[in-house]
Amino acid sequence: MSEPVIKSLLDTDMYKITMHAAVFTNFPDVTVTYKYTNRSSQLTFNKEAINWLKEQFSYLGNLRFTEEEIEYLKQEIPYLPSAYIKYISSSNYKLHPEEQISFTSEEIEGKPTHYKLKILVSGSWKDTILYEIPLLSLISEAYFKFVDIDWDYENQLEQAEKKAETLFDNGIRFSEFGTRRRRSLKAQDLIMQGIMKAVNGNPDRNKSLLLGTSNILFAKKYGVKPIGTVAHEWVMGVASISEDYLHANKNAMDCWINTFGAKNAGLALTDTFGTDDFLKSFRPPYSDAYVGVRQDSGDPVEYTKKISHHYHDVLKLPKFSKIICYSDSLNVEKAITYSHAAKENGMLATFGIGTNFTNDFRKKSEPQVKSEPLNIVIKLLEVNGNHAIKISDNLGKNMGDPATVKRVKEELGYTERSWSGDNEAHRWT
C-alpha cells in the first residue's frame, strides 16, 4: 500500500472553497458530472501509475476538515457564510470516492502498455466540487512517479528563488498558482521554500509583491495569504442550470455577490463565453464591486487593450483604478511583457503563475531538453442533465458538447479568434 499524498482538504485552490460555499448556498440540490481531459494526449500512462492512482483516490475518503483548519478558514476567508462553515465542520462531511468517481483506463491501439485514463466524477455539485484539484495533482504526480522518471529535484528551490527574485526586481506582484499541475507535492513545497527565500532576501520590498498562493495548505504553512478568484466552473454551472446563456455572466455575478457581499466580489473571470459577451453585462454595480478581471485565454496584449477601453472609455473610470490578473500559461518573461502592456494601458497588473513554478523540470539524461508537463483539466460535463460548455477567448480551450458550443456561439454572436500562443498539446514547451 502506498502512503497518501493528499493529507488535508486544504491542499486545494482557495477558489474551490469559495465556489463550494456559493454552490452550497445557492444550488444545494443540483447534480453534476465532471470529465477529465488530457489535452497533451501524446503523454500516456502505464499500469503502475493507474494502480497507484486508484489507491490515492480511495484515500481521499478518509479526509475531514480539522477544527484548526476550520478556524484558519474563518480567519482568512471571513466572508464564508456561517451555514457553510457549519456544514463542512460536521464530522459527517467527507468525500465518497468509491461512489462518486468512475475511473477506468483504455489501452491505446498499437501501443501495448500505454493507457489513456477515463475519469468521471458524479453526484450533487456540493458533494463533488472539491475533487478537481486533488485528482489533477495526483494524476500529474502519478505520471512523473511511474512514466516519465527521467528527472530529479536538483536546483528546484534555487530555480524558484531566482524566478521570484527576477519578478520582484521588475516590481511584479504575483501569486503562486501551481497546485493542479504540480510535478508532486514535494515539488510545490520546494517552490514555496524558494519563493519565501526570495521574499526574505529583501522583505521590505518583496513582502508586498508576493500576494500569496492559491494553495490554502501552503498559505497556512508559509504564513502568506491564500489567494483565489473564481473558476469557469461557476459560470458554466450557473449557465447550464438555467440554459440562459444571454444572461449567464450577470446571473453568475448576482449569485456570487449575494453570497459574499459586494466588497468581497474579488476578480471577475471574463472569458467563459468570450470576453466580448461578458463586457455587455460588466457595468455598474458589477464593474464597481469587482476590483478587476482575470485574463485566462486568448492574446493577453489585445485583451489588455480591450479591458482598458471598457474601463476608461466606456465606463469612464480613472486610470490605474482597476486590476488585470494574468493567469494563462505564464512564465517570468511573459509576466514582465504583460506588466508593461498593462502600464501602457492604465491598468494595475497582478499575475498568477502556476505550472512554470511547480512543473518546470529538465530531463536528467539531457539537461538541455525540457521534461514536458501534462496539460490536464477536469471540467463540468453536465449540470442537472444539461450540457455544460466553455467557449473562452481562443479555439483550443473550447470545452463540451460541440452542438451546444455552436448553438451558444450563434446565440451570443461570438467571434472566432485564434492566436500564436494557442497550442494546448505542448502548452509549456
Swiss-Prot record:
Q: Which residues bind nicotinate?
A: Y15, F177, T229, R294
Q: Name one GO cellular component term.
A: cytosol
User: Under which EC number(s) is this enzyme classified?
Assistant: 6.3.4.21
Q: Name its pathway.
A: Cofactor biosynthesis; NAD(+) biosynthesis; nicotinate D-ribonucleotide from nicotinate: step 1/1
EC top class, as a word: ligase
Biological role stated in the UniProt entry: Catalyzes the first step in the biosynthesis of NAD from nicotinic acid, the ATP-dependent synthesis of beta-nicotinate D-ribonucleotide from nicotinate and 5-phospho-D-ribose 1-phosphate. Essential for growth under anaerobic conditions.
Q: What is this protein called?
A: Nicotinate phosphoribosyltransferase
- Organism of this sequence: Saccharomyces cerevisiae (strain ATCC 204508 / S288c)
The organism's lineage is: Eukaryota, Fungi, Dikarya, Ascomycota, Saccharomycotina
Question: What gene is this protein a product of?
Answer: NPT1
